[in-house]
């Protein structure tokens, strides 16, 4: 069983110009444990910042006023030929011990051989510009694809990639690195991103995004590893000056990680 470990206290913090959004810590791993994370001034925050959104995951269930589920297999495996069926079952996503757990399982369900969960704040919370971060411990196994990311809130009317996509953190297979990437429409699909250096992704690290009208900057543990200019809509990047919402998921297989999946990494339950 793969677990996107607990989004525990302050898994995510979004610091806007005069606003701060806080979430908790996230972990995506085969076993569960997560340290508490407290909100404190971080990159992008100022003394005039105000917390505008947070989730402490200190209840008994996922807060439906903050999070929604995407169910099923999506169009063409969510556009990526992913191999899992996303559910809203507590088998795949639940709150326990002050944390959110997202778990990918090896099981036949809905015509697929794997299940998992994909949560988002679409229709519940969106923002334009700010600082957002999550503390994550990730799974590392062939065929696993955890992600902490954002999509433009206008995706329903303009589609992808015209809505824009910001991947704050993605990891695939057993690589000891993560990726930060932007996707948008510039007379066709455009993307620009960069991997981090090697480190142990199975341990907790803080993944952050600083977003303003000039740059999108990506951080791991407070260290910037990549930035992209969006000033004056450089490179047809007008998508990145509009509201976005947050997503968290663990995919299994797909075009990027490939279709060789290590089933031995999914313990029988």
For every predicted segment, state its role.
Residues 1-22:
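Bacterial Sec-dependent N-terminal signal peptides
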Residues 9-14, 40, 65, 97:
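Polar/charged alpha-helical tracts
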Residues 45-269:
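GH16 jelly-roll
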Residues 29-48:
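Sec-dependent signal peptide cleavage junction
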């Amino acid at each position: 069983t793969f677990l996107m470990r607990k989004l525990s206290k302050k898994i995510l913090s979004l610091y806007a110009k005069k606003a701060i959004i806080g979430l908790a810590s996230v972990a995506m791993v085969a076993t569960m444990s997560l340290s508490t994370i407290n909100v404190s001034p971080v990159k992008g925050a100022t003394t005039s910042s105000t917390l505008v959104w947070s989730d402490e995951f200190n209840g008994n269930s996922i807060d439906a006023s903050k999070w929604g589920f995407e169910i099923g297999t999506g169009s063409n495996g969510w556009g990526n030929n992913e191999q899992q069926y996303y559910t809203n079952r507590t088998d795949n996503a639940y709150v326990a011990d002050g944390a959110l757990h997202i778990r990918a399982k090896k099981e036949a369900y809905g015509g697929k051989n794997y299940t998992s969960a994909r949560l988002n704040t679409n229709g519940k919370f969106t923002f334009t510009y700010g600082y957002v971060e999550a503390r994550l411990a990730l799974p590392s196994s062939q065929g696993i694809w955890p992600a902490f990311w954002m999509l433009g809130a206008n995706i329903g009317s303009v589609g992808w990639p015209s809505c824009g996509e910001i991947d704050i953190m993605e990891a695939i297979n057993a690589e000891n690195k993560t990726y930060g990437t932007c996707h948008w429409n510039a007379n066709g699909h455009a993307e620009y991103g960069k991997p981090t250096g090697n480190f142990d992704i199975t341990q907790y690290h803080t993944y952050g995004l600083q977003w303003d009208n000039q740059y999108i900057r990506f951080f791991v543990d407070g260290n910037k590893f990549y930035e992209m200019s969006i000033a004056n809509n450089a490179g047809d990047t007008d998508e990145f000056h509009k509201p976005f919402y947050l997503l968290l998921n663990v995919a299994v297989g797909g075009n990027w990680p490939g279709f060789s999946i290590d089933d031995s990494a999914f313990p029988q339950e």
